[in-house]
Swiss-Prot record:
Name of the protein this chain belongs to: Ribose-5-phosphate isomerase A
SUPFAM superfamilies: D-ribose-5-phosphate isomerase (RpiA), lid domain, NagB/RpiA/CoA transferase-like
Residues that bind substrate: T28, G29, S30, T31, D81, G82, A83, D84, K94, G95, G96, G97, K121
UniProt organism field: Azoarcus sp. (strain BH72)
Pathway of action: Carbohydrate degradation; pentose phosphate pathway; D-ribose 5-phosphate from D-ribulose 5-phosphate (non-oxidative stage): step 1/1
Organism placement in taxonomy: Bacteria, Pseudomonadati, Pseudomonadota, Betaproteobacteria, Rhodocyclales
Length: 222
């Protein structure tokens, strides 16, 4: 199977978590695109979706799936999204597509976070994939200096502006052995909106696709 076929398999498996009358939180990225396409087939069963990006909103709307504003929703039963990396503690690096802030906001509201990805995204230690941070434009240089002091090699994502009008700096060369501490340290830097570590709010369920099929893992309660 190709990587895209594996992504599709994981995405379609997530449809099992969509129940009648539900409002579904929807992430961003190539794997989530497959989920949105699958969701279109059962759109008559759900109330609608809360989207984490303009790109996902456009795809949902193209399928005729009702879009709801997060501010009008008290709670989301489930949030479906991919990951650039996920470790064995269910902490993730996300935001390769630049939607990390809205993804983190929607995930925070959801009761269950279902991560969908292929087996290449499962890692022992996070950091091989560059860690994105969303930055207020006037703080770019200050944040890059602070990131370098933490041991990263920061690189501005040239020509990219987030849906919120901010910049993305990608941090290379990190070996993230304590994702929660790193997430907190980066968020404490003045000018950082948020970073792509999802550790304080990691995934609850992982649907991991391989040539042998889609396996389900649940985060330990301990």
């Amino acid at each position: 199977m190709t990587q895209d076929e594996l992504k599709k398999a994981a995405a379609l498996a997530a449809l099992d978590y969509v129940e009648d009358g539900m409002i579904v939180g929807v992430g961003t990225g190539s794997t989530v695109n497959h989920f949105i396409d699958g969701l279109a087939g059962i759109k008559h069963r759900i109330r609608g979706a809360v989207s984490s990006s303009e790109a996902s909103s456009k795809r949902l709307a193209a399928h005729g799936i009702a879009l709801l504003d997060l501010n009008d929703v008290d709670e989301l039963p489930v949030y479906i999204d991919g990951a650039d990396e996920i470790d064995h503690g269910f902490a993730m690096i996300k935001g390769g597509g630049g939607a990390l802030t809205r993804e983190k906001i929607v995930a925070a509201v959801a009761r269950r976070f279902v991560c969908i990805c292929d087996e290449s995204k499962r890692v022992d230690v996070l950091g091989r994939f560059p860690l994105p941070i969303e930055v207020i434009p006037m703080a770019r240089s200050q944040v890059m200096r602070a990131a370098a002091a933490l041991g990263a090699t920061p690189r501005l994502r040239e020509g990219f502006v987030t849906d919120n009008g901010n910049l993305i700096i990608d941090l290379h060369g990190l070996s993230i052995t304590d994702p929660c501490a790193t997430e907190q340290a980066l968020n404490a830097v003045v000018g950082v909106v948020t970073n792509g570590l999802f550790a304080a709010r990691g995934a609850d369920t992982l649907l991991l696709a391989s040539a042998q099929g889609v396996r389900r893992f649940e985060r330990s309660a301990t």
